[in-house]
Structure formats: C-alpha cells, structure tokens
Amino acid sequence: MTVALQGSLMVDVAGTWLTAEDRHLLRQPEVGGLIIFARNIEHPRQVRELSAAIRAVRPDLLLAVDQEGGRVQRLRQGFVRLPAMRALAAHPNAEYLAEQCGWIMATEVLAVGLDLSFAPVLDLDYQRSAVVGTRAFEGDPERAAVLAGAFIRGMNSAGMAATGKHFPGHGWAEADSHVAIPNDERSLEQIRANDLVPFARLSKQLAAVMPAHVIYPQVDAQPAGFSRRWLQDILRGELQFDGVIFSDDLSMAGAHVVGDAASRIEAALTAGCDMGLVCNDRAAAELALTAAQRMKVTPSARIARMRAQAKASTDYKQDPRWMLAVGALRDAQLIE
C-alpha cells in the first residue's frame, strides 16, 4: 500500500512571528516539526506567544531548539546561561551538577511551550574538533556516559525526552560539518571501543539520536546520517536502539555530498531517519517538501514519543527545586 509521507520534515521560520507563508508551510501534513533559532527569540513571553501561534496552526507539531549550554544555547535573554558541559567534569560532584543542568534546561524550554532541546552531546572531546570542543562532557567515554546519563535524568524528571548527538561520534573529525564534509579515518573497532560507548551505555535512556554529517570511510562511503550501515546495522541492530532518529540539518555543507535538498531528504529517510531537518534555507525546505510529498513511506509512530511529558509552570522560579538547582550551580561557580 502506498502511504503519503506525513510528519517527517522539521523546518524553521525566519522571524519572531509567523507570516502567511510560514502558516501555509506548517499546514502541510509532511511537516512534523519546527525548530527555533536565536533569530526567533526575544524573551520568554515572546517565545511562549510564538509557540502558541504555531500550535494554533498545527497543534501536533513537535517544537524544538538547540539548548545545550555553553556556546550552543538559543534561549538567552531571561534564561539561565548554563555552562558548557565540559566545565562540569572538573567538579567532585560533577554528576549531581550535570543532573541539575539537565533539569534547569528542560524546565525552561518546556515553560515557553517547546517540546525538546536536541541534547545532550555525546561526542568525545579529543581536543581535535573545534565544533565539538567544550560541548562534550569528557574525552573518556565511560565518564562521558556517566555525566550525560545524569544530564538525561534531569531532563526526564522535568518531562523532556533526550536526544543523543552526533552518532557515532563527531569528536575525532577536525572539519566542521556546518561548512565542510568531515572524514574520520579510524576503523570501526576504534570507534566502537571509544565513541560508541556513550551511545551504547545510554541506548535505553535516549528517546532519540541525531547522526553526524561525517564520513567514516572504513565503515561506509556515505555520511552516517545517510548510511544504512550506521543507522540500521549498527544503531538499530548492534545497539538495539528503538527511538527516533533525527537527521542533523540537511542544509549543512556536510550533507551536500548526496545532492540537492530533495536528494538529501530522500537519502536520510531511506537510510533510516524518522525525521529530517531542513533549516536556514526556505527554498531547500520547499524542495524537500516536494520530494516528501512524492515519496512512498510509512510515517514513523516513534516521533510522538518526543512530545513534552509535562508542561512547566511559568512560575517555575518559585519552585524549591529550582532554587536548589540554581544554588548548586552558583556555589560551583558555573553560573552567575
């Protein structure tokens, strides 16, 4: 039976409010999510209003943001400036602090009407990749898994599902996949012994995984996000992962190896992604939409698992747990 693709595209909008063109795009059944960026954000109340406007058009849309801490946090004015995750490792109570960071982040994101942040980063810090760097918890895979697991516990306790990225690990490749096509020349055995460890340890805690736009030529000629070898054989098969697979942004240079936006969304979904992100390029999003409309795939039921499990009160700063969590980070001199 032929089934029209529904809900397998995540797109974005240009401003702090919706245009008629935005509303038309969001009404397309193939669009299943929207990610917001810094350009869409002024302050918490405005983000809540934008979220409400989006849900008035499509109540079922998954609303996302990148709110990791450190240099990657889109929600800034009126929000806690969380530390880079690498800063936690030096503290004797790093695991406790990681859990508080996860809870604070998720609480603030949920309070403005969003469903999830694409976090945590499970890449290892080899001090080779500038694009990863301090976004990683650690260079040691077991320690990274412990700290990321604590961060996930905090997210989950606030009501948010976790997304581990960037599978199978972006930390060794030096090039930035936003502007280039990185290569990691290591063997599968080397990657399995190191970078895959956090993904393997946390496979049951992760609701989603986001693959890297990195080519691992000793494993497959395609970037991981377009590779059935990585997504089906290793992630689904070897690691027994049954959560959502989100592509990374298909507008990034690291994704261009497979062609135009139509080719990219087709390649990502065919390889095993449940949802493809097409951001910062409306023409590319429309091209991907056209491709999605002509594809014959079964919509993924997994995506519904990513919706917010709780709605944080706008008065969350009066919650004793908030005061305790923020106080712990201040005492550790991780936030102001």
For every predicted segment, state its role.
Residues 42-49, 90-107, 139-147, 189-192:
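Glycine-rich anion/phosphate-binding loops
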Residues 300, 308-336:
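A short C-terminal boundary segment appended to hydrolase-like catalytic domains
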Residues 1-63, 71-79, 334-336:
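N-terminal hydrophobic targeting/anchoring segments and the immediately downstream early-domain regions
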Residues 39-57, 73, 149-316:
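Second-shell residues forming the walls of enzyme active-site clefts
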Residues 55-80, 98-124, 144, 152-168:
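Glycine-rich, aromatic-flanked loop segments that form ligand/cofactor-binding clefts
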Residues 13-27, 97-108, 193-199, 259-267:
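Short, acidic/polar
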Residues 7-18, 85-100, 180-193, 251-259:
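Active-site mouth loops of central-metabolism enzymes
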Residues 7-13, 32-36, 61-67, 116-120, ...:
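Hydrophobic faces of well-ordered beta-strands that scaffold small-molecule active sites
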